[in-house]
C-alpha cells in the first residue's frame, strides 16, 4: 500500500460516502488508493471462518473474533479494509461506527483467500503492508490456493518483521499478544 495519495482514485471521505450508499450485498474496501470490491464468501470460506472462531473461543474466551469488521488501515489510516475476521478484546468495538481505528485493542486481522483475480495483490501484497502500517500485531492469512496459513507478526516501520507459513494440518503458533496455537488438522478437509 505504498502509492502516495496523489494517485488515489478518490479521497477516503469520497470512498466512505460511496460505501454508505452501496447495497448490503456489495462489500467495498479502499486499499492503496483504489476502490476494491471484495468477493462474497463461498461455503468453504464460511466454514473455515467458523473453524477459526471456535478455536479462538476455546483458547481465548476473553476475545471476540468479529467478522467483516471495517478497519482504518495504512499510513495515516488512509485505507479502509473489511477483514474476514478481527480479533480484539470483548466489547472493544462497542460504540464504534462502520470503520474502527486500529490504534489500540486490535490484536489480529484475518483474511481467508477467495477465488478471484485480485486475491494475490489484495491479500498477499497490499493487506500485509496496510495492516503492518496500522500497527496490527498479527495478520493471519488462510490461503486456500496453496493450502497454507501464513502468520505475519512484529510490525515495524510499515512492515511485518516475522513471516512464517504452515501447511494445513500443522500446529500454527500465533505469537503474542494473541498467544495460542491453532490445530489446523480440520483444514485438510478444505484442501485442493
Whereabouts are the PLM-identified features?
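Gly/Pro/Ser/Thr-rich low-complexity, intrinsically disordered segments predominantly at protein N-termini
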Residues: 1-192
Amino acid at each position: 500500500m505504498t502509492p502516495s495519495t496523489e494517485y488515489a482514485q478518490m479521497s477516503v471521505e469520497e470512498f466512505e460516502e460511496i460505501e454508505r450508499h452501496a447495497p448490503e450485498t456489495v462489500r467495498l474496501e479502499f486499499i492503496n488508493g483504489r476502490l476494491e470490491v471484495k468477493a462474497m464468501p463461498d461455503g468453504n470460506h464460511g466454514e473455515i471462518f467458523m473453524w477459526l472462531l471456535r478455536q479462538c473461543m476455546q483458547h481465548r474466551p476473553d476475545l471476540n473474533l468479529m467478522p467483516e469488521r471495517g478497519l482504518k488501515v495504512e499510513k495515516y489510516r488512509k485505507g479502509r479494509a473489511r477483514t474476514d475476521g478481527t480479533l480484539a478484546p470483548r466489547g472493544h468495538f462497542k460504540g464504534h461506527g462502520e470503520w474502527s481505528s486500529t490504534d489500540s485493542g486490535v490484536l489480529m486481522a484475518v483474511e481467508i483467500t477467495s477465488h478471484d483475480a485480485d486475491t494475490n495483490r489484495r491479500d498477499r501484497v497490499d493487506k500485509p503492508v496496510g495492516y503492518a502500517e496500522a500497527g496490527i500485531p498479527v495478520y493471519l492469512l488462510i490461503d486456500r490456493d496453496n493450502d497454507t496459513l501464513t502468520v505475519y507478526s512484529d510490525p515495524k516501520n510499515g512492515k511485518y518483521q516475522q513471516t512464517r507459513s504452515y501447511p494445513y494440518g500443522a500446529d500454527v503458533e500465533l505469537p503474542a499478544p494473541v498467544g495460542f496455537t491453532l490445530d489446523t488438522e480440520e483444514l485438510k478437509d478444505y484442501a485442493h
